[in-house]
């Protein structure tokens, strides 16, 4: 198989929100039958056609790094986790629509991943502790995905989605809400699939066509993975 250029996308969020199920769905187009807790980091690869259907179309590997752990972990754990944040080209923040705390904690995940973790360990960030303008100069493409949409009754969905609207205001990304146990939410041609493709296109553009400001500051560039198979890699 010919070597393909690749980009690295972090998948961050609290344990139990469905990150592993999401990554499996994105990379294998299948529902994950028996999801388990991620220890350390699990990496899977998605094949993406950049600018599909245009003269500029080109195939890339999207490395999705599912980072385990809790945002309230001890400093030593967070320090170890930081190694996974090297040379990142994009971030997908994942939260559970049925768990308000998991949505609020994305603010702390963003601070940690963007190397601006100024909040004491174990303290949940509230609006009073958090400065939205910290992200005004962020150049890393971001996407927010809410999971377990199927567990919210139709009559409650508007209320829940309004409650999590601050995520889009804080990070200024597009937002996708879905059920990881139902592939139809990412069916070709759907609005979610279009948003996802647009996000990956932006990540690729930042990495290969806009060379400035396309990686998390404070982390040196590391060697890229060599060409290989689509086999999942696990870091424990």
From Swiss-Prot:
Disulfide bonds: none
Example of a GO biological process term: regulation of Ras protein signal transduction
Keywords tagged on the record: Disease variant, GTP-binding, Nucleotide-binding
SUPFAM superfamilies reported for this sequence: P-loop containing nucleoside triphosphate hydrolases
One Pfam family cited in the UniProt record for this chain: Roc
Residues forming coiled coils: none
SMART domains referenced in this protein's UniProt entry, alphabetically: RAB
Binding site for GTP: 16-21, 148-150, 179-180
Source organism, top-level taxon: Eukaryota
A GO cellular-component term linked to this record: endomembrane system
Protein task: Required for KRAS signaling regulation and modulation of cell proliferation. Regulator of KRAS prenylation, and probably prenylation of other small GTPases. Required for lymphocyte development and function. Not required for myeloid cell development.
Pathology noted in the entry: Pancreatic cancer 5: A malignant neoplasm of the pancreas. Tumors can arise from both the exocrine and endocrine portions of the pancreas, but 95% of them develop from the exocrine portion, including the ductal epithelium, acinar cells, connective tissue, and lymphatic tissue.
Family: Belongs to the small GTPase superfamily. Rab family.
Known partners and oligomeric status: Homodimer. Interacts with GPR89; the interaction stabilizes GPR89. Interacts with RAP1GDS1.
Name of the protein: Rab-like protein 3
């Amino acid at each position: 198989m010919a070597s393909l250029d690749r980009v690295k996308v972090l998948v961050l969020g609290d344990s139990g929100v469905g990150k592993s199920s999401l990554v499996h769905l994105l990379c294998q187009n299948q529902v994950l039958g028996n999801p388990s807790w991620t220890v350390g980091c699990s990496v899977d690869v998605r094949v993406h056609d950049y600018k599909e259907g245009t003269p500029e179309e080109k195939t890339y590997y999207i490395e999705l790094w599912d980072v385990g752990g809790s945002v309230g972990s001890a400093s030593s754990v967070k320090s170890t986790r930081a190694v996974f944040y090297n040379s990142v080209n994009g971030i997908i923040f994942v939260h559970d629509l049925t768990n308000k705390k998991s949505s609020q904690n994305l603010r702390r995940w963003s601070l940690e991943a963007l190397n601006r973790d100024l909040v004491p360990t174990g303290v949940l960030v509230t609006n009073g502790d958090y400065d939205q303008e910290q992200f005004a100069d962020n150049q890393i493409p971001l996407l927010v995905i809410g999971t377990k949409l199927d567990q919210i009754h139709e009559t409650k969905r508007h209320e829940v989605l309004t409650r999590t609207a601050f995520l889009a205001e804080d990070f200024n990304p597009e937002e996708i809400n879905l059920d990881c146990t139902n592939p139809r939410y990412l069916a070709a041609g759907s609005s979610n699939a279009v948003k996802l493709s647009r996000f990956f296109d932006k990540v690729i553009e930042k990495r290969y066509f806009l060379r400035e400001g396309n990686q998390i500051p404070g982390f040196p560039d590391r060697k890229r993975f060599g060409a290989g198979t689509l086999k999942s890699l696990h870091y424990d």
